[in-house]
Amino acid sequence: IIENLYVIANNAYNHVDNNHKTLKEYQGEDLILVADALGNWYAEVYNMYKRLDFGKIDNNMKERDHLLKTTNKLLDKQIEHIRTTENSPKNSKLYFSILLETNELISSTFKLLRLHKEFEEFKTQYKSN
């Protein structure tokens, strides 16, 4: 998870540090949309951990699937933009890297959540025996 965040931050920092052009307006809007949805998802994940209540993990899984579909649609949209309009290769690279690492971040977080749920179930079962 930390590595995913590092890659996103480092790529964005290098883009700005090298004085590359800003992202296109639609790219910024798309990333804000993803960031908002991701923030809501992480709030749910945080609450699960806070309460140690993994009963709603199926709902969280559906939300995760929705987030992954959203980022994949945005990747497809960017590919279409590259085919039909003139785009800066550096902007496209940054945009792709942010979305792809976001997918990895979502997957890494969910793996951790699932492992924690399994551990809690094992612990409960072990106490009953």
Model-derived features: positions:
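Cytosolic, long alpha-helical scaffolding segments
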Residues: 1-129
